[in-house]
């Protein structure tokens, strides 16, 4: 077990979250069709600065992430600085940790504060599944390089003769793991079968997610953390997530066919997160800097942990590996938590992780621990719904979850919450936050 640690700056201050905001999340090729991630990122960071009313000079660093990267803007963080009111001298760099990317960006800001390098910064992430880097085949790519080097017409003709019709076809971004060739959906199917996750249980979690997210919107609980977006060419706006289905019903979901194993599978388009466009960001400061600027504090970062695991099987079990470490570092148990927010990449993955939280066998064989961290209290779990309902712009989900959890804790009068996510490549993230 990891010993409890106090996450403090060199001056003994806590790391504070002072504000968080996100765009509405939109399904692929809908309201944000044609809007690149960098523009979504600019939109949300500018809104965050406007919301706090601070001078941009107080933002000493911007760490931002993008999973589906565009070759023309490889450092999305720097492009955001150059495209907003932040001073041109603002330090900015980009990170990527698949679906845990904005957890990583928030941790990087926190670590810079712990080291005493900065007292305030912005972390976040953005992704667009509607604006994708469509590539070319490997043979075509090599031919293009050779053509650029060729000096005569004959040399160029010789290079072109090597290409067949298939070599000319565009190549969409890969959906499979580079190391295994398995897609996330195939891994979710494997986890459902291995851990006996039924189709009915997956669909029930899906309906729960949509109904709770719909109820949260109807109650007005999300309106302060979701901006109204006016994407170019500014002819329309979006103020709510467009994937949430408040009328979702088990009977309707039961009619859908499996996607990844059509004969024996249970993972459908409905009980999986859809491809999504969106951006989110949080502003973080030391306690003293927030006080100097007169900014209210949403909450504090108590602890965090990342995990890496095998990719051939149970690749999306990251929360079950990272959460125990985050709890140990916070000096807490699962029962001490008031809220638990777990990223719902797939209902199957979510339910499998929930099982492993309570499995002594898993704890002993996989984690080297004496016993499991415990059974999840469903009254604390994803109380506002999860990614199945909201959608999942890969790099934006982490800071969406952090802001949402902090606001919900404050609405309930304070407490401690866990946010945790799986990520491609066999990665996991867990972060414990608290409010007063």
UniProtKB/Swiss-Prot annotation:
Main location: cytoplasm
Coiled-coil stretches noted in the UniProt entry, renumbered to this chain: none
Subunit relationships: Heterotetramer of two alpha chains (FadJ) and two beta chains (FadI).
Record key words, sorted: Acyltransferase, Cytoplasm, Fatty acid metabolism, Lipid degradation, Lipid metabolism, Transferase
Active-site residues, record numbering mapped to chain: 99 (acyl-thioester intermediate), 392 (proton acceptor), 422 (proton acceptor)
Listed name of the protein: 3-ketoacyl-CoA thiolase
Organism of derivation: Idiomarina loihiensis (strain ATCC BAA-735 / DSM 15497 / L2-TR)
Origin: domain of life: Bacteria
One Pfam family here: Thiolase_N
Reaction catalysed by this enzyme: an acyl-CoA + acetyl-CoA = a 3-oxoacyl-CoA + CoA
EC number: 2.3.1.16
Family per similarity comment: Belongs to the thiolase-like superfamily. Thiolase family.
Biological processes annotated in GO: fatty acid beta-oxidation
Localization, UniProt: Cytoplasm
GO molecular function: acetyl-CoA C-acyltransferase activity
Enzyme class: transferase
Pathway: Lipid metabolism; fatty acid beta-oxidation
Keyword Oxidoreductase in annotation: no
């Amino acid at each position: 077990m990891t010993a409890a640690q106090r996450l403090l700056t060199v001056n003994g201050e806590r790391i504070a979250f002072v504000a968080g905001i996100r765009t509405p999340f939109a399904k692929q090729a809908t309201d944000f069709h044609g809007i690149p991630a960098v523009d979504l990122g600019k939109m949300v960071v500018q809104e965050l600065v406007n919301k706090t009313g601070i001078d941009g000079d107080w933002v000493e660093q911007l760490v931002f992430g993008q999973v589906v990267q565009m070759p023309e803007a490889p450092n999305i963080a720097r492009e955001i600085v150059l495209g907003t009111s932040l001073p041109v001298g603002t330090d900015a760099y980009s990170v990527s940790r698949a679906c845990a990317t904005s957890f990583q960006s928030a941790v990087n800001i926190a670590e810079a504060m712990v080291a005493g390098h900065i007292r305030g910064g912005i972390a976040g992430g953005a992704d667009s599944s509607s604006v994708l880097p469509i590539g070319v085949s490997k043979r075509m790519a090599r031919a293009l390089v050779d053509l650029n080097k060729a000096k005569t017409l004959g040399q160029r003709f010789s290079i072109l003769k090597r290409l067949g019709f298939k070599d000319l076809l565009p190549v969409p971004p890969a959906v499979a793991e580079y190391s295994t060739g398995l897609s996330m959906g195939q891994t979710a199917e494997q986890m459902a079968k291995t851990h006996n996750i039924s189709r009915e249980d997956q669909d029930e979690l899906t309906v729960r997610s949509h109904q709770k997210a719909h109820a949260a919107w109807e109650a007005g609980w999300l309106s302060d953390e979701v901006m109204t977006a006016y994407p170019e060419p500014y002819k329309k706006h979006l103020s709510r997530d467009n994937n949430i289905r408040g009328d979702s019903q088990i009977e309707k979901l039961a009619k859908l066919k499996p996607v990844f194993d059509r004969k024996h599978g249970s993972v459908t388009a409905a009980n999986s997160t859809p491809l999504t466009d969106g951006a989110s960001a949080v502003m973080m400061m030391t306690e003293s800097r927030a006080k100097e600027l007169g900014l209210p504090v949403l909450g504090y970062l108590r602890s965090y942990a990342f995990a890496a695991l095998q990719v051939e099987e149970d690749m999306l079990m990251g929360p079950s590996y990272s959460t125990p470490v985050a709890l140990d570092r916070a000096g807490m148990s699962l029962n001490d938590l008031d809220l638990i927010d777990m990223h719902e990449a797939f209902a199957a993955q979510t339910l499998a992780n929930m099982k492993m939280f309570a499995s002594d066998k898993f704890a002993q064989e996989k984690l080297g621990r004496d016993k499991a961290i415990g059974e999840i209290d469903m009254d604390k779990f994803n109380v506002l719904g999860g990614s199945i309902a909201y959608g999942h712009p890969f790099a934006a989900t982490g800071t969406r979850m952090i802001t949402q959890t902090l606001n919900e804790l404050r609405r309930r009068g304070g407490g401690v919450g866990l946010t945790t996510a799986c990520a491609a490549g066999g990665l996991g993230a867990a972060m414990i936050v608290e409010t007063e």
